[in-house]
A protein has these predicted regions:
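Structural signature of nuclease core domains in nucleic-acid processing machines
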Residues: 1-196
């Protein structure tokens, strides 16, 4: 059984405020940022512990912990069930996908990697994989296509929305050793891979 102390913590909003800088989610995305933060913490943990240790039943048994983490991240009580289900579905879908399994299994991957650029900006990269020809930088996303989306329209919208962010990540990783970096967005719930 999973215990809350075994997992990465998600800092409550009031702790950031006590340090003098309140952490605010972008309202336009609702609870999406909190869901993403909690899902990323779980994916990092599963990747480090090994996906064989995480059957779907263990994830299902961890929903109460997810709700606690989401609540601490600012999700309202009224939205906790929906938000926790989004995290659960993201994790289960990642484990069910061959691409998701590969991303969790890849040896020597840097997970939730904090990098500082020349301007002092910190970026937390979900996953960076050193390959023979350079780097692969992957940003997990918890969203799903709209009902009327085609794969191409969804990919184009996501490139528009997240492209600058993933390119910044690639630049930061490439600056470490001069090797090229390519970026991708991975949407486990829809099993969609978007090259950026």
């Amino acid at each position: 059984r999973v215990h809350e102390n075994d997992l990465p913590s998600v800092e409550p909003q009031h702790n950031a405020a006590q340090r003098g800088a309140a952490w605010q989610w972008h309202e336009e995305f609702g609870d999406e940022a909190a869901i993403g933060t909690v899902a990323h913490a779980w994916l990092e943990h599963i990747g480090k512990e090994g996906l064989e240790q995480w059957p779907a039943q263990r994830i299902d048994a961890s929903v109460a912990i997810m709700k606690t983490q989401l609540g601490r991240a600012g999700v309202s009580r009224a939205e906790l069930d929906t938000a926790a289900d989004a995290v659960r579905l993201t994790l289960v879908a990642t484990l069910a996908s061959s691409r998701g399994q590969w991303l969790l299994r890849v040896a020597g991957a840097y997970r939730e990697w904090s990098l500082l650029d020349a301007t002092g900006r910190v970026s937390v990269i979900d996953l960076a994989i050193s390959e023979e020809k350079g780097w692969l930088v992957v940003d997990y996303k918890t969203g799903v296509p709209w009902p009327d989306d085609t794969p191409d329209t969804f990919a184009a919208r996501m490139r528009e929305r997240h492209g600058a962010q993933i390119q910044r990540y690639c630049s930061q990783v490439s600056a470490l050793d001069g090797r090229p970096a390519r970026g991708a967005l991975y949407f486990p719930r829809a099993d969609i891979w978007v090259e950026c």
